[in-house]
């Protein structure tokens, strides 16, 4: 049996290619209620639905920002929310040329018999959920698998379980019209060097693409959301050019050219750091059969959140900060970012959270 060739085939290919358009990327605004609560706590804002809606409206309705955004990942609550004037967020995004996406996983659980390694849950009723989300206007989905680097981690068991879980999710999405974003995140936590991260990334990505092929996933109708290849959070930092070289080499060795785009997660890097690293990859003269873009959450929102601080009078200032980050990352997808963006408060600070849960 060959790759998926059902009724959504052409639509999946078209939407995946569109999301990967050079000059554009993904805004990850799919934080769970608990996670956004932690972000709000940092600016002393109460975690209630109206504040969550107000912050997301601030982002989605920033004039000029969505020209740099091809897709927005939403949380279940946000997919059905409206602006204060009563316009559904899904319509706001579509009219601005950004495809709505949806987070479909249900978080991680520990794998028995391992050293606190995890697998991701959410396969039960996933087909039904995807059909419902497609009906509501979503056109792509996200599922996050999490692996750790340690003395004996990741184990082969954790690698295989997560690869199979991602592949099973991916084919269910495609059968229901959603482009699956395949996200095997290798956490940055630890003292490991960049070579160890590169090795683990290669092993994990190879396992993922083996599983995707076994599940007959249409690669042209998927996107990959990996971590950049970097030293661990407790190791000495390296230059963006080094990260670019290691990351692109890792992808060359593992990601088939049928995949239209690779959209990096920021993994707790500062806003500016994530942009500079992405820019260095796109400046690198090397074989890159896929476009290299972004799917940033914290790295697009941090300075915006700080500027807003939950106050209506700060909305314009916050939108200006958001526009700066969107434009900078758009330039980074083209390798033309000069590092000259006006840095808002928080743009240079590390956003790393140990054992990060989305």
From Swiss-Prot:
This protein's UniProt keywords: Cytoplasm, Glycolysis, Lyase, Schiff base
Binding-site list for substrate: 39, 266-268, 298
Enzyme kind, highest EC tier: lyase
InterPro entries in the cross-refs: Aldolase_I_AS, Aldolase_TIM, FBA_I
Cellular localization per UniProt: Cytoplasm, Cytosol
Major site of localization recorded for this protein: cytoplasm
Lineage: superkingdom: Eukaryota
A GO term from the CC aspect: cytosol
PANTHER family found in the cross-reference section: FRUCTOSE-BISPHOSPHATE ALDOLASE
Name this polypeptide is given: Fructose-bisphosphate aldolase 2, cytoplasmic
Lineage: Eukaryota, Viridiplantae, Streptophyta, Embryophyta, Tracheophyta
